[in-house]
Amino acid sequence: MKKSISFIHLSDIHFTKFSGDSFDIDQNLRDEIIRDISRNAKTCLENVEGILVCGDIAFSSQESEYEKAEVFLKKIADVLSISETAVYCVPGNHDIDQSIAYEGSVLHLIQSELEKANTSVAIDSKLGGYARDKSSNDTLFKHIETYNEKFAGKYSCNINNEKPNWQVDFPLNDNNILRLYGLNSIVISSKDDHKDKTKDKLMIIGKYQVPKNEDGVTYMSLCHHPPECWKDPNNDVQKMINKRVRIQLYGHKHIQEIRRIDDSLIIGSGATQPSRFEEGWNPRYNWINIQVVEIKCDTFLNVKIYQRILTPEEDEFIADKDDDSSDEFKEY
């Protein structure tokens, strides 16, 4: 068995209908990601198992946008000599079809009722009620139908009422399991997300999405919205996830941040392809390496995060290092 396993970690790619045309200046940064992986990741990383995408693959959930994303991800897979289907993804707010979740639609009415719930018990009760009601259960996933059918389904990461979360297992070097686990944070996402210009609408997760405890399993979750963007009374869901998920990957905020809460490592990823109108435009992505190490007869999970950042000249991705460090990665 190989010593460690690795992943390429992307988030917020935002492919548009113009991506790849003759005037797309962001084609350069995507090319530089491919070049960086070819020149550097292949020599630094052992046993790359896949590409992780924490949502906002598309800009407006159009089929053509997902087709372009698929081509880009295939190029990465080809460089790494892994299967083109070794992609693991979750939806973001840009992956919803806003024409489905319009005001007055059945979905919008259900979302509005869910948004009114103000306790964990009420949230879980309403989610369970709508999910079990045959007249409405499929409606909860209607706004990501294009995402599911034209993109995520190709990687077995599509979600629905029968499979609200996906999971994939990889063997660790101590014969235990690393389990990737997809969380859906866009249940109530709609065109109203930014209706209040002073604050964003908080998203609902629900306890039904918290992975179950299982001996010998280490969880690494993917979710678009981080916990500070959740409507989570008393932080009930977050507390459960912090206890059960050792590595948590998030997107959405376009801010690179790594922190620890007890035994859980929380990685907020910067945007791979942010809008150039965004203040502090700063394309980023990560490499992640995971292994179990033994120290004085005890075993520990060792995680290395290689933070990659585009240079100001936009000519290559390099390691984002602390001023006082020469390390190419952060180790936890």
Regions found by a protein language model. Give the residues of each.
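Active-site neighborhood of phospho(di)ester-bond hydrolases with catalytic His/Asp-centered motifs
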Residues: 9-11, 49-56, 82-93, 220-228, ...
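A short C-terminal boundary segment appended to hydrolase-like catalytic domains
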Residues: 290-332
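Beta-strand-turn-beta hairpins that frame and shape the catalytic cleft
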Residues: 1-8, 163-182, 217, 260-265
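Conserved beta-sheet core of the metallophosphoesterase superfamily
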Residues: 175, 227-298
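Active-site environment of divalent metal-dependent phosphoester hydrolases
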Residues: 16-18, 58-61, 91-104, 190, ...
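Active-site-proximal segments of metal-dependent phosphoesterases and phosphodiesterases across multiple
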Residues: 21-22, 185-249, 258
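N-terminal active-site segment of His-dependent metallophosphoesterases
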Residues: 1-90, 96-101, 208-214
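Extended active-site neighborhood of metal-dependent phosphoesterases/phosphodiesterases
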Residues: 70-196
